Amino acid sequence: MVLPTAPEPPTLLGYHRILSSSAGVRVSPLCLGTMSFGNGWKGVMGECDQATSFNMLDTFYESGGNFIDVANFYQGGDSERWVGEWMAQRQNRDEIVLSTKYTMGYTMFGPQKIKSNYQGNHTKSLRLSVKASLQKLQTDYIDLLYVHMWDFTTSVEEVMRSLNHLVANGKVLYLGVSDTPAWLVVKCNAFARANGLTPFSVYQGHWSCAFRDFERDILPMCESEGMGLAPWGVLGRGQFRSAEDFSREGRKMGPQDEKHRRLGEKLDQMAQQKNTKATSIAQAYVMHKAPYVFPVIGGRKVEHLKENIEALGLVLSEEEIREIDDAEPFDVGFPMNFLFETPTQSYRTNMTSKDIWQLSCNTRLETVPKQQPIEPFQGAKYFGSASK
């Protein structure tokens, strides 16, 4: 007997992927960021009321998305509360892969008189934060819990033992880390593996064609550690526009610097050739550079979310990736520039030992290529279905 194939997803967002080689949970290729959902920060970020937030969540979910990112700190807790209310009303909690974070001072505007232990990486902060997050999210478990940032006061041993306790008790399924130096992540994972504890499976941080620091240590570290990548800031936070377009009225996170102007012109040029948007090129860029990349896409407008979903079908050639790389100089720094760069060769993330010029003196080495990312439409082609 042959079982029927699952129905065709409504969009490319419904072709799910493995989160990382160390985390087998299935997630949509985009992660919906919810930092704008709430009233707590509307004076800074602009208004995104509950109806608008629910509309964004509904659009994402109905399009096949199941990967949603929140944090205890966002909007004074509104983001977690609203996502929790939405899941309760839609009765879809177990369909969602939900990530949240701890470490930030989430009680900043709370009634507590002494707030020193409501932040940090330590065990008490973790216990208080997770207890509060579970209540706000109206759930009894968190799929993916991130260390939001490293506090440089709590030991590796305390962090990993405390996190593993939550996993062992079923309150957390997978562990992630955000905004933390690569050497610390490797140290944490080495301690976890040596002691039978749960290591980090995902890294979240700032990465875009304008901010490529990720490519120095974080990206190689994730490849080596078997970790997925959930980059934020991929779309340039409204900065990836031509100078003319940026000068028009609209919400801006700040003035456009020269780097973003140059990249905006390059992305806009490519977008016109492909009949798409500059932000779509920016999204495709990071998803073409490494496997297990799940951009955290936020915002307040459904039409922008739909553009992000459509961009999953955008194909960039290796030459186009190089054009974007070369549009703005990037210094990978020592030792990678010493090992891989020459007057005629710039560092690329897909380089292997055959590209180390010092080792080519004695032999012409053949090496296995690095693992490649999933190609756009790969699932649709395999199952013989047309994209939507």
From Swiss-Prot:
Enzyme class: oxidoreductase
Any one GO MF annotation of this record: oxidoreductase activity
GO biological process, one term: aflatoxin biosynthetic process
Superkingdom of source: Eukaryota
Protein family per UniProt: Belongs to the aldo/keto reductase family. Aldo/keto reductase 2 subfamily.
Residues reported in the UniProt entry to bind NADP(+): 233-243
E.C. no: 1.1.1.-
Cleaved signal peptide residues: none
This protein's record includes keyword Protease: no
UniProt source species: Aspergillus flavus (strain ATCC 200026 / FGSC A1120 / IAM 13836 / NRRL 3357 / JCM 12722 / SRRC 167)
Gene field: norA
Protein name: Norsolorinic acid reductase
The keyword NADP belongs to this UniProt entry's keyword annotation: yes
Keywords: NADP, Oxidoreductase
Active site: 74
Pfam families found in the cross-reference section: Aldo_ket_red (PF00248)
Pathway where it operates: Mycotoxin biosynthesis; aflatoxin biosynthesis
